[in-house]
């Protein structure tokens, strides 16, 4: 029978009132007795609001969170075809290690699914040297029998290659890079890049005939994602942006976030316990080098990171609030052709005011139209059947030339 109680998961409950700094944190290198199994250990792990425990007990706790996320909702069918997205971050390596461990258990405890791994190469888009291919090949050997694939962000799904056949090369005709250069603001570039990445992963899943995709977002990532979605005008789809299951992808591909309940501290402890070596840190994402105030995404990320450092329980509250947002599941509503979110087709006062302001701004010094004319123009824009939601339409307006799609 499972010995890990419900209090081990989710919000910290009464622990919200505790001062984090008053607790001993970090990995205790001095030997001691595990509070769970009472075995003397040379290295104890002390998580916030939990007693110190040995490596084996900590790994059992963290892996149980992963299994509980999938098992509680029963959203992963038996023998499902799963595509795990690897980006070289600590979170994606933890997800890979947990899935591999779950696949190598005995029949009773085994997670029954067929997994493949795809590494999305983003270095060229970011203007950096290609990833260390030898490190990827070592991963594919370590986590056999998983099949490893590589695809470059911005490439066609048909360019998908097995890791053993892949050789990095600079593609001067990468259309995604040219499109990013045409977008005026970093906010628009980061938003556009995120949607393109999601669409590429969906296409790869369809090529490999995978019905489910595993992404490695943890609680702090989803808290950031929730606030960013609202700031960008994607509030209508914010619930799916932080949910365990996101079914907006085309071709009946379902996106799962099985690490959604893990914290940043648990990820770092798991990396230490398993001696994993991340290739990239969170600060190496596209556009992060431009500073905190360069985009809405950077600013929101810095805000949540500050909360995580000083008021860790607040981040959990933000994340759990996103869990409680109801999903708009009207099958009759059309979807955005770019991000697959439900179209905000109803003419709201807020959207009308935004388009009215945009019309005035574009008219500039040559403004000669009356208020009624401008309002009519704003309504016409909203009623335009371009197939884009409000947020994607905002990206379109940032383009110097060309079409978003």
Curated annotation (Swiss-Prot):
Query: Sorted alphabetically, which keywords does the UniProt record give?
Result: Cytoplasm, tRNA processing
> In its keyword annotation, does this UniProt entry include Signal?
no
Q: Which GO terms describe its molecular function?
A: nucleotidyltransferase activity; sulfurtransferase activity; tRNA binding
Give any Gene Ontology cellular component.
cytosolic tRNA wobble base thiouridylase complex
Major subcellular site? cytoplasm
From the record, what ranges are coiled-coil?
Answer: none
Q: Where in the cell is it found?
A: Cytoplasm
Could you tell me the Gene Ontology terms of the biological process aspect for this record?
Answer: protein urmylation; tRNA thio-modification; tRNA wobble position uridine thiolation; tRNA wobble uridine modification
Its annotated pathway reads: tRNA modification; 5-methoxycarbonylmethyl-2-thiouridine-tRNA biosynthesis
Q: Mind telling me which Pfam families this protein's record contains?
A: CTU2
Q: Which family does it belong to?
A: Belongs to the CTU2/NCS2 family.
What function is annotated for this protein?
Plays a central role in 2-thiolation of mcm(5)S(2)U at tRNA wobble positions of tRNA(Lys), tRNA(Glu) and tRNA(Gln). May act by forming a heterodimer with NCS6/CTU1 that ligates sulfur from thiocarboxylated URM1 onto the uridine of tRNAs at wobble position.
Its name, as the record gives it, is: Cytoplasmic tRNA 2-thiolation protein 2
The organism of origin for this protein: Drosophila melanogaster (Fruit fly)
């Amino acid at each position: 029978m499972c010995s890990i109680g419900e209090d081990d998961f989710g919000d910290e409950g009464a622990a919200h009132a505790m001062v984090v700094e008053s607790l001993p944190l970090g990995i205790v290198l001095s030997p001691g007795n595990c509070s769970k199994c009472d075995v003397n250990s040379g290295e104890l792990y002390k998580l916030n609001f939990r007693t110190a425990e040995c490596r084996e007990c900590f790994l059992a706790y963290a892996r149980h969170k992963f299994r509980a996320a999938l098992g509680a909702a029963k959203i992963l069918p038996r023998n499902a075809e799963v595509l795990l997205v690897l980006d070289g971050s600590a979170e994606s390596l933890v997800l890979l290690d947990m899935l591999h461990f779950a696949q190598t258990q005995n029949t009773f405890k085994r997670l029954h699914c067929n997994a493949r791994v795809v590494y999305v190469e983003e270095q060229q888009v970011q203007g950096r040297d290609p990833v260390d291919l030898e490190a990827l090949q070592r991963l594919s050997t370590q986590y056999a029998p998983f099949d490893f694939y590589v695809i470059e962000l911005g490439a066609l799904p048909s360019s998908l290659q097995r890791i053993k056949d892949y050789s990095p090369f600079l593609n001067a005709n990468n259309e995604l890079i040219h499109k990013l250069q045409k977008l005026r603001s970093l906010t628009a570039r980061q938003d556009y890049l995120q949607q393109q990445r999601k669409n590429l992963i969906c296409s790869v899943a369809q090529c490999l005939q995978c019905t489910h995709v595993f992404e490695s977002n943890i609680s702090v990532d989803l808290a950031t994602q929730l606030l960013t979605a609202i700031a960008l005008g994607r509030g209508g789809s914010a619930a799916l942006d932080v949910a365990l299951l996101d079914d907006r992808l085309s071709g009946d591909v379902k996106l799962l976030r099985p690490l959604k309940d893990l914290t940043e501290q648990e990820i770092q402890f798991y990396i230490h316990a398993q001696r994993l070596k991340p290739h990239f840190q969170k600060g190496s994402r596209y556009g992060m080098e431009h500073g905190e105030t360069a985009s809405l995404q950077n600013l929101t990320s810095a805000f949540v990171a500050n909360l995580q450092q000083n008021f860790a329980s607040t981040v959990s509250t933000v994340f759990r609030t996103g869990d409680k947002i109801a999903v708009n599941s009207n099958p009759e509503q059309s979807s955005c052709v770019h991000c697959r979110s439900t179209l905000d087709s109803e003419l709201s006062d807020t959207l009308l005011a935004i388009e009215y302001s945009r019309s005035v701004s574009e008219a500039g010094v040559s403004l000669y139209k009356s208020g009624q004319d401008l309002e009519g123009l704003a309504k016409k824009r909203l009623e335009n059947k371009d197939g884009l939601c409000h947020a994607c339409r905002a990206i379109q307006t940032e383009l110097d030339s060309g079409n978003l799609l």
